[in-house]
């Protein structure tokens, strides 16, 4: 998870450094908008564990499986945590 965050931050920094002229300013503006969107998603990312998760996807979804320490309840599809 930490490595994923570091890669994303590095990508945002690289996108912000791609300033250009001679017709590349439109691409730079789009990259800036994408970088802003990525950072906004990182800042507003949910900290709480997911409340519900499909018991089949629970074991396949890395975000869900990191919170479902006690497994997923197959009847209610609720993510059980210890």
Curated annotation (Swiss-Prot):
Record family assignment: Belongs to the Pg turripeptide superfamily.
Name recorded for this polypeptide: Turripeptide IX-23
Prosegment location in residue numbers: 24-50
Keywords carried by this UniProt record: Disulfide bond, Neurotoxin, Secreted, Signal, Toxin
Annotated S-S bridges: 53-68, 58-72, 64-79
Any one Gene Ontology molecular-function term assigned to this protein's record: toxin activity
Gene Ontology cellular component list: extracellular region
Organism, scientific name: Gemmula speciosa (Splendid gem-turris)
Superkingdom per UniProt: Eukaryota
């Amino acid at each position: 998870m930490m490595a994923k965050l570091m890669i994303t931050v590095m990508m945002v920094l690289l996108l912000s450094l791609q300033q250009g002229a001679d017709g590349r300013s439109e691409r730079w503006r789009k990259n800036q908008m994408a970088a802003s969107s990525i950072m906004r998603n990182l800042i507003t990312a949910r900290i709480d564990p997911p409340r519900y998760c499909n018991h089949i996807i629970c074991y396949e979804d890395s975000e869900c499986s990191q919170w479902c320490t006690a497994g997923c309840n197959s009847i209610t599809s609720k993510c059980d945590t210890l």
